[in-house]
């Protein structure tokens, strides 16, 4: 009986070990320390791909949260929370960042230059996120780049939830 119990325990330990090996990586956990470095790290490998997809007129991989960020409180997934901007000050810092601001302007320009609609490029859910992002940065930027995307893609209509969160 004792041998059977030990064998069963060993089998359970092996199964647990292999389940750990095969388990998918969990989504990032929300954190209190919101350094912009989280965006730089996330964009390191994916930004060139994201830009290529927008220029080709079709988003096919998953990068919307850290390429076109929106305010925290609009999305409920771990990624939306983790990459959500805390407010207008963090949005200003994002836009002023030498890497992040340059990339956001570049990929936003690619959206403007596309002959595709936002829905064709991003699909329904991510089009909503794009509108939130463009609304936020149109409030922050001194130029009209982000407002021009709102005009082109959303008939000039800002995202009301973003404006509400901004106060």
What are the residue ranges of the model-derived segments?
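A long, hydrophobic alpha-helical segment
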Residues: 43-55
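Charged phosphate-binding loop/patch that engages nucleotide di/tri-phosphates or the phosphate backbone
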Residues: 142-167
């Amino acid at each position: 009986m004792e041998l059977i119990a030990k064998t069963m325990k060993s089998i359970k330990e092996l199964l647990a070990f292999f389940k750990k090996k095969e388990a998918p990586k969990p989504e990032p956990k929300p954190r209190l320390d919101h350094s912009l470095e989280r965006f730089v790290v996330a964009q390191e490998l994916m930004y060139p791909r994201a830009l290529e997809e927008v220029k080709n007129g079709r988003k096919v991989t998953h990068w919307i949260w850290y390429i076109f960020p929106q305010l925290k409180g609009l999305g409920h997934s771990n990624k939306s929370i983790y990459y959500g901007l805390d407010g207008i000050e963090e949005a200003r810092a994002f836009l002023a960042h030498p890497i992040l601001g340059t990339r956001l302007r570049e990929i936003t320009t690619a959206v403007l230059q596309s002959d595709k609609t936002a829905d064709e490029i991003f699909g329904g859910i991510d089009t909503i996120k794009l509108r939130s992002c463009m609304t936020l940065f149109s409030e922050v930027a001194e130029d009209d780049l982000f407002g021009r995307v709102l005009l082109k893609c959303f008939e000039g209509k800002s995202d009301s939830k973003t404006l509400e969160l901004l106060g």
